[in-house]
């Protein structure tokens, strides 16, 4: 870093939040006196800075020619609105002349008339950059500075009358009134002044501009569009009273009021003819993504499709439980959307959604078992009297059945019923599992008949190799009728073996 003397004084430009900066633990930037005018844009106060080089925690940095430190001492405070501060800097060696234009613009922006007069004494042309200083004063609403500039020959009509545009944009009603006296065109730049007065909610100013010829319909009724988008209810109401077209731009005003959740404005626009149907379902999806329950309820009440799969997906993916409840309140049939909701809830681990579905008497356990989702079943508090186990076995989900059995010692299962259906469905693994439990089926002949009917030779072999003297006459007849030669041969062989034994 550059060398500096032990007692060298540095400078920092600070703003109105200076006390917050002083108490901060952030890195502090400062400068030498020869660069101080380059930092005017950062505030309206000047602090003299010394460096606590004897502090063992002190660190000094240089970044792209900028000086900063983690610890500094704040000394004398100067007001940059006071010409004496600039005199002091010049006396200390600061070269002000190369910076006069920037100082002029900075002072005009802040309304520091004394500083403007100060740099004027140095011979600076107040009209530099096509009277830009005057436009900056209008932007800030510094009327004393505006009047001073006009008295000293600056033209308020310079740059296509843009002074009135800035004055209106930033809500400076009195400044606009001053400028109009000098015959500025309030419709300049496509009615910029009115458009931005409406954008920022300045009703009194907007009314004044309209009374003086500003066009409320400029830019395809931009005024009511932007006022609606920005949430200015009273401005929207005022513009409607002045004849603004609420349907302009394919109901732009209503569309964006809804997108910003300004329902009170949306209702106002609809009252005067705006059509909500244009983007109804798209806005519902967007509102769900924002988790805006008020807007979703409003759209649902106005006919939006709450059964839209994108809506359901969005709500469950983001775990918006209150939003789901809102849709139910407005007519969503949970049972009809059960598969979509539970599939996403399972994938995203949304237990609160699953618990809510259970509270609404949706049989989530049955759904999980039917689809063979062991991971999902494990997410559910299991209260099963045996039906879930039976269903899992009949559908061939042995892992789920074993889990349910492990979670409930007080279950009742009709294993004979399960055995018959397992044989019918050809569930070899389930049949073997049931037999391994040393259960004794009560309807073996019936099970054999179902296995034969559906062509499950492997099931027949398991049963008939274990049990003797099973009546299979009907099954032999079925095998002939169904043209199952392998099954027929096996059954006849079983019958012959019985007779031999």
From Swiss-Prot:
SMART domains in the cross-refs: ANK (SM00248)
Keyword line: ANK repeat, Repeat
SUPFAM superfamilies given in the database record: Ankyrin repeat
ANK repeat ranges per the UniProt record: 67-98, 100-128, 129-158, 160-188, 189-218, 220-248, 250-278, 280-306, 307-336, 338-366, 384-413, 415-442, 443-472, 474-500
Source organism, top-level taxon: Viruses
Protein name according to UniProt: Putative ankyrin repeat protein R760
Species of origin: Acanthamoeba polyphaga mimivirus (APMV)
Organism placement in taxonomy: Viruses, Varidnaviria, Bamfordvirae, Nucleocytoviricota, Megaviricetes
